[in-house]
């Protein structure tokens, strides 16, 4: 009986079983950072949309290292993060079996893009969501009931979370249904958290009020789907020798005669990608401001630095491929993140206390690349391209027709 001569570690991790399609499209926060009442009241998570990647040049600030004070080129991901709108407050009580919801209070006015989340087919529906609930805020009995609810939450709740949704109308996506999630409020006492959340009902919360420059965060999302794949692609098992009968990209032995079934740990073909994953320790290189109007002019230069003073936006020439233009606030993260373009990502504050030097390093960007990401881009701005290419034939024809 033939057998392999040497043992080897198994291919692929069993820690992520079952490898099947995620049941949810938006990344779920399974645990929030530990609360610290000595800190000011703040949110612990935010939603963003993956736009694409580019690269930056920066000077390393790591005394004692060989690369200290030297320039490095690093890949970065741009995540568009328009302000989120707070539309509800949820109070939780601690029980022997974990957290249980105590009371949920929604705002008086809720936008249609948020209401769409409560319907499967908005077009055919009667669009009656929250019509009865909003009357609570208008009559005297309802107002008294809401006050009683707020006071009971202050008395009994240990954890306060807000319900916030994204603003799809600000994004270059076709989707109209907003993404909705609960975000835990940390810092201060329960009464301070509740007052903070109540003040911000129906208000927008920008990303720079949640995260800061050079902060380490976690990214939660669903990976890019690959469909049904064979065992070699899915588990990275070794290909069999060339002369193998009935295929090479297979597992030769899937188990013993008895027990007369295939063990769960044996690599098999099946779904690859579209899995729910959490990546920790992604460093924020820049929190950029969206387009704004100042003195009647549209200000776009959110990609210029102290070393590169050219007037350019974060968008590469032609926009981000398969996404479009980033016109809102954005977060620049080091390296890559899960998911395809347009994928909704959950950004969460780190659960760990960061002490490593790389985590605490100050980032000073020298240059942000804005060349076209479709082909081999050469030009940083449209003006630079025009100066190099000279007058074009189409411009001359348009000028002649105008004359």
Swiss-Prot record:
Keywords: Acetylation, Cytoplasm, Isopeptide bond, Methylation, Nucleus, Phosphoprotein, Ribonucleoprotein, Ribosomal protein, Ubl conjugation
Modified residues (Tele-methylhistidine): 245
Basic residues bias locations: 18-31
Chain residue numbers at which the record places covalent cross-link Glycyl lysine isopeptide (Lys-Gly) (interchain with G-Cter in SUMO1): 294
Location in or out of the cell: Nucleus, Nucleolus; Cytoplasm
List of residues that carry N6-acetyllysine: 136, 286, 294, 366, 373
Gene Ontology MF annotations: RNA binding; structural constituent of ribosome
GO cellular component: cytosolic large ribosomal subunit; nucleolus
Xref: InterPro entries: L3_arc_euk (IPR045077), Ribosomal_L3_dom_3_arc_sf (IPR044892), Ribosomal_uL3 (IPR000597), Ribosomal_uL3_CS (IPR019926), Transl_B-barrel_sf (IPR009000)
Pfam families for the chain: Ribosomal_L3
PTM (free text): Constitutively monomethylated at His-245 by METTL18. Methylation at His-245 regulates translation elongation by slowing ribosome traversal on tyrosine codons: slower elongation provides enough time for proper folding of synthesized proteins and prevents cellular aggregation of tyrosine-rich proteins It is not required for incorporation of RPL3 into ribosomes.
Start and end residues of each stretch annotated as Disordered: 1-38
Annotated crosslink Glycyl lysine isopeptide (Lys-Gly) (interchain with G-Cter in SUMO2) location: 39, 224, 226, 286, 366, 386, 393, 399
Keyword Transcription regulation among UniProt keywords: no
Chain positions with Phosphoserine modification: 13, 304
Gene Ontology BP, a term: translation
Family indicated by similarity: Belongs to the universal ribosomal protein uL3 family.
Quaternary data: Component of the large ribosomal subunit. Interacts with DHX33.
Role according to the record: Component of the large ribosomal subunit. The ribosome is a large ribonucleoprotein complex responsible for the synthesis of proteins in the cell.
PANTHER family: 60S RIBOSOMAL PROTEIN L3-RELATED, LARGE RIBOSOMAL SUBUNIT PROTEIN UL3
Name of the featured protein: Large ribosomal subunit protein uL3
